[in-house]
A protein has these predicted regions:
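Conserved beta-alpha-beta core of the PfkB/ribokinase-like small-molecule kinase fold
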Residues: 23, 27-98, 121
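Active-site donor-binding loop signature of nucleotide-sugar glycosyltransferases
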Residues: 1-2, 78, 135, 191
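Structural motif
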Residues: 13-16, 42, 65-68, 103-105, ...
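Conserved phosphate-binding/catalytic region of the ribokinase-like
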Residues: 90, 94-208
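A generic local structural motif
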Residues: 9-13, 37-40, 61-65, 98-102, ...
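Conserved phosphate-binding/catalytic loop of the ribokinase/pfkB sugar-kinase fold
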Residues: 1-38
Length: 208
């Protein structure tokens, strides 16, 4: 605690920037301190597309804060454990992933949810459309950064005009695997390196 991200200040330049920015991406830890929490709430008001990468790491989260942020969110990303934890917090029994996602969509009026499933791939829900994709098989060298790279790959296509769910998810699972196959959370690589890897590892949607 008491590090730089606990004391992020609201700046008019940042609020102005968000009016022309494609997305605001944030996690839970950024709101553990009152100063940064207030700033985050102001930023979400200025942003048109809020992406919440949920991190339920005790003791650095508050369920009331999580709910408040989800009400401001257009796209939320959970892992399997976080999905079940969220349902427990809300007194909802787990039935299936699809039922759980639809429940959260309804409660928070949020169309898009991603569930990362580790070695079993990832599920993307956009409204009533569900897309399950496998992981790309690689020799794992470092899993640090794989979740962030998955989301970065997802957004790089999601925010492009004219892309479809297959292109979005292929980019996401490919970039996650590409980073996992290298040492370090932020390995050096070129766009050509990744594009070649992605195009050599084609994937297809899985049955739900």
């Amino acid at each position: 605690q008491h590090v730089a991200w606990d004391y992020i200040e609201t700046r008019s330049a940042d609020l102005n920037l968000l009016t022309d920015t494609d997305a605001l991406v944030f996690g839970t830890l950024a709101a553990r301190n009152e100063k940064s929490k207030n700033t985050l709430f102001e930023l979400t008001e200025a942003s048109n597309y809020n992406v919440f990468d949920i991190n339920l790491r005790p003791p650095y989260y508050d369920i009331h804060l999580i709910k408040d942020l989800l009400h401001r969110t257009q796209l939320a990303k959970f892992n399997k454990a976080e999905l079940r934890m969220m349902l427990d917090f809300m007194g909802k029994d787990y039935v299936t992933e699809k039922d759980s996602i639809q429940y959260l969509q309804d409660v928070f009026r949020m169309n898009e949810i991603i569930i990362s499933k580790g070695s079993k791939g990832a599920l993307y829900a956009n409204g009533n459309n569900f897309h399950l994709y496998p992981t790309v098989p690689v020799e794992v060298k470092d899993t640090v950064g794989s979740g962030d790279s998955f989301l970065a790959g997802f957004l790089s296509k999601r925010l492009e005009t004219g892309t479809n769910a297959h292109q979005i998810m292929h980019q996401a699972v490919a970039l996650g695997a590409f980073i996992t196959a290298q040492k370090g959370a932020c390995p050096e690589y070129t766009l050509d390196d990744f594009t070649k890897f992605r195009d050599q590892h084609l994937v297809s949607t899985l049955p739900l």
